Regions:
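Solvent-exposed alpha-helices and their adjacent loops that cap or buttress functional pockets
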Residues: 11, 21-26, 63-66, 91-94, ...
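Phosphate-binding/switch loop-helix module in NTP-utilizing enzymes
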Residues: 37-89
Length: 146
């Protein structure tokens, strides 16, 4: 995502109000990412349990977003501690709901069913579903690539 938004060489900065997210020069989209917090971009981030939960809390509570029209949170597929932590932290804000993202492959079907069940059990509205990596049409020649 950092490459698509042209922020791969930008770092999160700390201000008196909290962390200042990176901002895409092309789209004005503010991005807060673990990748922007580490010095070596090729390093793996291996956080588990409480350390991961604390980082999520800090990213949500200590980031100075300014005025937002909406907040998108990119999470790993499935239903995990990350999802529970985020939902617990945002519950008082009464989020409008979730936009689920899946791929067109058959193995993704079970995962998306679990995510739908998770949203239902947590009383979180599903706003929509995005099918990712289905195909693209070349803007130069018009050829469809699956």
């Amino acid at each position: 995502m950092a490459n698509m938004l042209a922020i791969s060489n930008k770092a999160i900065t700390s201000t008196q109000w909290g962390w200042k997210p990176c901002e895409s020069p092309h789209y004005g989209i503010k991005v807060m990412s673990v990748a922007s917090l580490i010095d070596k971009k090729e390093s793996a981030v291996i956080y588990k349990g409480p350390r991961k939960t604390n980082l999520i809390k800090r990213m949500l509570k200590e980031t100075f977003w300014g005025k937002l029209d909406f907040l998108l949170i990119d999470t790993p597929p499935g239903t995990s501690d990350e999802h529970l932590t985020i939902l617990r932290l945002l519950k008082n804000l009464n989020p409008d709901g979730a936009i689920l993202v899946s791929t067109a492959q058959k193995f993704s079907l079970n995962t998306i069913r679990k995510e739908i069940s998770f949203c239902y059990k947590m009383k979180l509205n599903i706003i929509g579903l995005v099918e990712n990596m289905s195909y693209f049409v070349c803007p130069n020649c018009g050829t469809r690539h699956d």
